C-alpha cells in the first residue's frame, strides 16, 4: 500500500480545509512546490494535488502553482479540482500530470468520464466523496441521493485506474479513518481504491493497511502531515513493509 501526501492549493498557497469548508482554512505554506518536494524527499511515491479554487469555481485556477510542482518533483503527480472537460484533462496531461481526478463530473456526466478513460487510458481516477454513504459534489457543497458504491459500480468496465474514496465527515478532522465503510466500499467493487479522510497517526496507517486484501491500494493523508501527528517517512515504511519498493498500483 502506498501513502500519498496531499497538497491542496488555494490562491496559490498550500492549505487544508476541515470537512471541505472554505471558511475553515489553515495556510501551511506559501510555496506548494516546496511542500511537494519535502514530501517527495520523505519517500512519497506520488503527490496528490487539489486545486481548491478550481473545485469551488468549476474551472482550473492554479495552473501556475501546479506547473511549478511538476517542474520540481520527479514522482508522479495526480491532480483534481475543477476538471470538467476533456480539453482541461489534455492540458494537465500535456503539462506532465500522471493522473486526472474527476469528481463532480463522474455523477453529472458519466459518459464523458468513460470517454476520457478511452482517450487517456490508465490516466483517469474517479474521486468519490461520501457523506454518510451518499455522494457529495461541487466541492462537497451538495449531497446527492446517489450511493457512493452505486456510482463506483457504474464505472466497473470503463477502465478507471482507481477510485479515491473520501469520507467527508472524517476529512481534515483527524478522527481516524472510517475503516468499516472503506472496507465495505472496496469489497463491493473490483476497481483499486485509495482511501482518504481522517488519518491522523501511524495507528491509522496500520488500520488502513489491513484493507489491502480488500482492494485498498493506497491512502491519502494531509492535515496529519502538516500538524506533525504523522511522520511521512514512518508512514511510508509501515505501509510498504514487505512490498516491492517499486510497487505502483496505478
From Swiss-Prot:
<feature type="active site" description="Proton donor">
    <location>
        <position position="129"/>
    </location>
</feature>
<keyword id="KW-0368">Histidine biosynthesis</keyword>
<dbReference type="GO" id="GO:0005737">
    <property type="term" value="C:cytoplasm"/>
</dbReference>
<comment type="pathway">
    <text>Amino-acid biosynthesis; L-histidine biosynthesis; L-histidine from 5-phospho-alpha-D-ribose 1-diphosphate: step 4/9.</text>
</comment>
<feature type="active site" description="Proton acceptor">
    <location>
        <position position="8"/>
    </location>
</feature>
<keyword id="KW-0963">Cytoplasm</keyword>
<dbReference type="InterPro" id="IPR006063">
    <property type="entry name" value="HisA_bact_arch"/>
</dbReference>
<dbReference type="InterPro" id="IPR044524">
    <property type="entry name" value="Isoase_HisA-like"/>
</dbReference>
<comment type="similarity">
    <text>Belongs to the HisA/HisF family.</text>
</comment>
<dbReference type="InterPro" id="IPR011060">
    <property type="entry name" value="RibuloseP-bd_barrel"/>
</dbReference>
<protein>
    <recommendedName>
        <fullName>1-(5-phosphoribosyl)-5-[(5-phosphoribosylamino)methylideneamino] imidazole-4-carboxamide isomerase</fullName>
        <ecNumber>5.3.1.16</ecNumber>
    </recommendedName>
</protein>
<dbReference type="Pfam" id="PF00977">
    <property type="entry name" value="His_biosynth"/>
</dbReference>
<dbReference type="InterPro" id="IPR006062">
    <property type="entry name" value="His_biosynth"/>
</dbReference>
<keyword id="KW-0028">Amino-acid biosynthesis</keyword>
<keyword id="KW-0413">Isomerase</keyword>
<dbReference type="InterPro" id="IPR023016">
    <property type="entry name" value="Isoase_HisA-like_bact"/>
</dbReference>
<dbReference type="InterPro" id="IPR013785">
    <property type="entry name" value="Aldolase_TIM"/>
</dbReference>
<dbReference type="GO" id="GO:0000162">
    <property type="term" value="P:L-tryptophan biosynthetic process"/>
</dbReference>
<dbReference type="GO" id="GO:0000105">
    <property type="term" value="P:L-histidine biosynthetic process"/>
</dbReference>
<dbReference type="GO" id="GO:0003949">
    <property type="term" value="F:1-(5-phosphoribosyl)-5-[(5-phosphoribosylamino)methylideneamino]imidazole-4-carboxamide isomerase activity"/>
</dbReference>
Amino acid at each position: 500500500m502506498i501513502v500519498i501526501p496531499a497538497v491542496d492549493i488555494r490562491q496559490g498557497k498550500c492549505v487544508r480545509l476541515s470537512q471541505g469548508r472554505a471558511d475553515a482554512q489553515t495556510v501551511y505554506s506559501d510555496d506548494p512546490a516546496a511542500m511537494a518536494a519535502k514530501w517527495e524527499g520523505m519517500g512519497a511515491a506520488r503527490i496528490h494535488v487539489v486545486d481548491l479554487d478550481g473545485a469551488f469555481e468549476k474551472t482550473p485556477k492554479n495552473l501556475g502553482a501546479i506547473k511549478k510542482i511538476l517542474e520540481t518533483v520527479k514522482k508522479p503527480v495526480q491532480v483534481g479540482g475543477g476538471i470538467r472537460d476533456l480539453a482541461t484533462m489534455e492540458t494537465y496531461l500535456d503539462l506532465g500530470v500522471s493522473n486526472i481526478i474527476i469528481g463532480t463530473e463522474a455523477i453529472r456526466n458519466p459518459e464523458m468520464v468513460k470517454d476520457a478513460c478511452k482517450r487517456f487510458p490508465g490516466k483517469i481516477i474517479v474521486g468519490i466523496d461520501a457523506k454518510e454513504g451518499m455522494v457529495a459534489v461541487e466541492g462537497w457543497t451538495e449531497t446527492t441521493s446517489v450511493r457512493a458504491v452505486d456510482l463506483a459500480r457504474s464505472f466497473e468496465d470503463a477502465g478507471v485506474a482507481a477510485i479515491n474514496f473520501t469520507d467527508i465527515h472524517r476529512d481534515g478532522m483527524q478522527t481516524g479513518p472510517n475503516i468499516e465503510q472503506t472496507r465495505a466500499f472496496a469489497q463491493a467493487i473490483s476497481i483499486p481504491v485509495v482511501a482518504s479522510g481522517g488519518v491522523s497517526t501511524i495507528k491509522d496507517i496500520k488500520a488502513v493497511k489491513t484493507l489491502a486484501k480488500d482492494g485498498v491500494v493506497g491512502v491519502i493523508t494531509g492535515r496529519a502531515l502538516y500538524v506533525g501527528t504523522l511522520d511521512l517517512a514512518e508512514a511510508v515504511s509501515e505501509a510498504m513493509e514487505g512490498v516491492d519498493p517499486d510497487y505502483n498500483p496505478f
